Amino acid sequence: MMKVLVVFALLVTLISYSSSEGIDDLEADELLSLMANEQTRAKACTPRYYDCSHDRHSCCRSSMFKDVCTCFYPEGGDNKEVCTCQQPKHLKYMEKATDKIKNLFG
């Protein structure tokens, strides 16, 4: 029960923060310039379901969370490890719930 309350409080905080319009123009401009500089510095990310075995920290971000490089051994007797960028199920459900709440109130 406590975990549910903590997750709910976290979601409410994220939604209220993302929908707040308290950033003034100067801070918004500074933030945009910092983000532009960061994106020019960043290397290309690995899209979801693509091979990430070369760099396990290169997975792209979804709308809220970063995908995780998940490694597994495929069925069929091949002992070669396969790694792909995937979104964990709990994060997928949190994104869907947040989107539904935003659509409901926004």
Swiss-Prot record:
Coiled coil: none annotated. It is found in: Secreted. Keywords: Disulfide bond, Knottin, Secreted, Signal, Toxin. Expressed by the venom gland. InterPro entries: Spider_toxin_CSTX_knottin, Spider_toxin_CSTX_Knottin_CS. Belongs to the neurotoxin 19 (CSTX) family. 02 (D7) subfamily. This is Toxin-like structure LSTX-D7. It comes from Lycosa singoriensis (Wolf spider).
